[in-house]
Amino acid sequence: STSSAQTSAISQQSDTLRVVAESVGVYVNYGSNPTATNENIYVGTNDDLKISLGPVSAQKVVAVTKGTSTIIDFPEGTGSPFDVGDTVSLTAPNQSAFDFSHQTVTAVNRTSNVGGFYGTRITVSYNSSAVSGTFADPDATLRKSFKVAVKTEAGTGKAYIQQVQAS
């Protein structure tokens, strides 16, 4: 429709987003909570446009501290590809109770040797206090996540959105 519609959260897997407009041109915006307007990227009818999302931001997770805010610890020596204000999604395939989607990073702590802690840790605005058990998933990954907003130039139409590998 001619009003902005937004996708659910998408975990970033590649550096490029492909948008195909079917039957009518669309305006596209992306980010943590985007709204599409006539000032955004335009994709013409039956056109195909590739949009650069920037480098993929992802990191292994070695510890999760539960609470009204959630603290995520990364392996020593790796750092954090995330900054305050980024939105992230956690996938813990062996402990899915710890999974969360599209939560905001509220703090990044890069200070070493605070209480014997040497890795980078971040705080996320996710309330994990109701999650039971102790985190111990060696395959857990935190990824930057985003949403895509689309607005047609007139009437109704469809837009197909997918992450692709650009070569």
Please name every model-derived segment.
Residues 20-40:
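Short, surface-exposed beta-strand/strand-loop-strand elements in extracellular ectodomains
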Residues 10-16, 67-69:
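Short coil/turn motif common to extracellular beta-sandwich-like domains
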Residues 7-9, 48-54, 74-75:
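Exposed aromatic-hydrophobic patches
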Residues 1-13, 55-56:
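Solvent-exposed, flexible loop/coil segments flanking beta-strands in beta-rich domains
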Residues 12, 42-44, 65, 83:
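Residue-level recognition of short, solvent-exposed, well-ordered loop/turn junctions
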Residues 12-14, 20-27, 77-83, 153-155:
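Short proline/glycine-enriched turn/loop motifs at strand-loop junctions of beta-rich domains
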Residues 36-55:
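Intrinsically disordered, low-complexity Pro/Gly/Ser/Thr-rich segments with frequent PxxP/GP/PP motifs
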Residues 55-167:
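Small/polar beta-strand repeat architecture
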